A protein has these predicted regions:
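Compact, glycine-rich, soluble single-domain proteins
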Residues: 1-73
Length: 73
């Protein structure tokens, strides 16, 4: 896969999510906190991203996860 600007939407999602965009180094480049369920708003990466990770809304704040951190998987 390649890095490119990406976006996410919540139109069919019934619960709030934290949306994390990661670059190819798995660095968090953008977090959208508690994205609203069923929203048709686009949530952009803002920069080229290779991955997106979804967690329950509030997870990032509750676990002190922020932009600039690295993820392993």
């Amino acid at each position: 896969k390649e890095q490119k600007p990406r976006s996410f939407w919540m139109a069919n999602t019934p619960l709030p999510l934290d949306i994390l965009f990661l670059n190819s180094d798995k660095k968090i480049i953008r977090i959208h906190h508690s994205a609203q369920p069923y929203s048709e708003k686009r949530f952009p990466s803002g920069k080229p991203a290779q991955y997106v990770v979804e967690t329950n809304g509030g997870f990032c704040i509750n676990h002190d996860i922020h932009e600039g951190m690295y993820v392993t998987f």
